[in-house]
Curated annotation (Swiss-Prot):
It comes from Aspergillus flavus (strain ATCC 200026 / FGSC A1120 / IAM 13836 / NRRL 3357 / JCM 12722 / SRRC 167). It is found in: Secreted. Keywords: Carbohydrate metabolism, Cell wall biogenesis/degradation, Glycoprotein, Glycosidase, Hydrolase, Polysaccharide degradation, Repeat, Secreted, Signal. This is Probable endo-xylogalacturonan hydrolase A. It comes from the Eukaryota. GO terms for molecular function: polygalacturonase activity. PROSITE patterns: POLYGALACTURONASE.
């Protein structure tokens, strides 16, 4: 018979044998390197390199790196879809050149589609990477046929943690970058964006950034040359910061347009340290009036700070009759709700187009116009600085003249 003491001693022996000795190997904590893929370029515009790139995304997209090497051209003859990317690092050091085919692109939404992706770095580490939308033929066709539907170069919808940096983007058929679909946490930094036509047909509708339904979007250190909005805060934009940006030839930093056919809201947007050159306006708000199928426009907590105005037609503009004529708006006045709109620290000189007027602030008579202006030191070439006002508050902060329109 085995005594209780014997059982206890045997148990201790078993425990001592089960316990690991100090000489045993510790668990491996070595960090495994990210998978890396370099797609093979076809070397000819007759070969579509999109399948090779998407195969690389499939192979290395889950936490890996895809490299477009320097001094190499990849010809993209179809839509590039980032499906399969999750925390992937897509490095463009060479050239991604899209086909100019107007037949192929007609009706397409995007040239580069980033849909519901969680974690993407689209960047050039060396600063040499270029994405060419090859949009000249699309601009020429649109000049002849305004029904021609052109794609956005980079279309981001849904997803989160998107970073785009260090790249040059050029000549999109339409908008450069669109962010919508409740995207969150998107950053765009150190970019050069230019749309330049070599014909008499302007690169119409080449907004640099259309920021729609999204939260926590940052745009910084970007140089833009285009023929439409520099940055447009579209319906649903919330917590968007734009800083250290220069725009040439654009329509400015714009809220809107809002309220065309639905109730639209933009809130918590901040634009700071902006240089606007030869643009139709440096900054402004565009809302449709009441009546018809138009909805209610609401803009809350929008700040425009430290703008340098160089040859822009207006330094600041509020349009409450956007998209309609004066006769319509007399019967259906603007009803937009503008709350917490701050304009401060504007300096520089406008163009001579509206001289002596430097700003045109036409708030809707049926709406709310909570706007304050301070440190506004913009002048027209003549040296005058006339500000046209309509339905603005008595504590606006600047001296007003009648005659506001738009």
């Amino acid at each position: 018979m085995i005594s209780l003491n014997s059982i206890f001693l045997l148990s201790l022996v078993g425990l001592s044998r089960a316990a690991p000795s100090r000489s045993e190997t510790s668990p491996d904590r070595t960090i495994k390197p990210r998978a890396a893929c370099t797609p093979t370029a076809g070397g000819s515009s007759s070969t579509d390199d999109v399948p090779a790139i998407q195969e690389a995304i499939t192979s290395c997209g889950d936490g890996g790196t895809i490299v477009i090497p320097a001094d190499t051209t990849y010809y993209l003859n179809s839509v590039l879809d980032f499906k399969g990317c999750s925390n992937c690092d897509f490095q463009v050091e060479g050239l991604l050149q899209f086909t100019s085919s107007t037949d192929y692109w007609n009706g397409k939404t995007a040239m580069i589609s980033v849909s519901d992706i969680d974690g993407l770095k689209l960047r050039s580490v060396t600063g040499s990477g270029v994405i060419d939308g090859n949009g000249q033929e699309s601009w020429d066709k649109f000049a002849e046929d305004s029904s021609y539907k052109r794609p956005t170069l980079l279309y981001i919808t849904g997803g989160s943690n998107i970073e785009v940096s260090g790249l040059r983007q050029k000549n999109p058929p339409n908008v450069f970058i669109s962010v919508k679909g409740d995207t969150s946490n998107a950053q765009f930094t150190s970019l050069t964006m230019d749309a330049t036509s070599n014909s008499d047909n302007l690169p119409k509708n080449t907004d640099a950034f259309d920021i729609g339904a999204s939260t926590y979007v940052t745009i910084s250190s970007v140089a833009i040359t285009n023929d439409d909005d520099c940055v447009a805060f579209k319906p649903g934009a919330n917590y968007v910061t734009v800083e250290n940006v220069s725009c040439t030839g654009s329509h400015g930093i714009s809220v809107g347009s809002l309220g065309k056919s639905s109730d639209d809201t933009v809130q918590n947007v901040y634009a700071r340290n902006i240089t606007m050159i030869n643009s139709s306006k440096a900054a402004g708000i565009k809302t449709y009036p009441s009546g018809g199928d138009h909805g209610l426009s609401t803009v809350k907590n929008a700040t425009f700070e430290d703008f340098i105005v160089d040859g822009c037609d207006y330094a600041f503009q509020i349009q409450s009759c956007y998209g309609e004529d004066d006769t319509y708006c007399e019967e259906n006045p603007g009803d937009a709700v503008l709350e917490g709109i701050v304009v401060k620290g504007f300096t520089g000189t406008t163009s001579d187009k509206e001289d002596p007027v430097v700003a045109n602030l036409n708030c809707g008579s049926k709406g709310t116009c909570d706007v304050t202006i301070s440190g506004f030191e913009v002048k027209a070439p003549s040296g005058d600085a006339k500000i046209l006002c309509g339905n603005t508050p008595s504590d606006l902060g600047v001296t007003c003249s009648s005659g506001a329109s738009g």
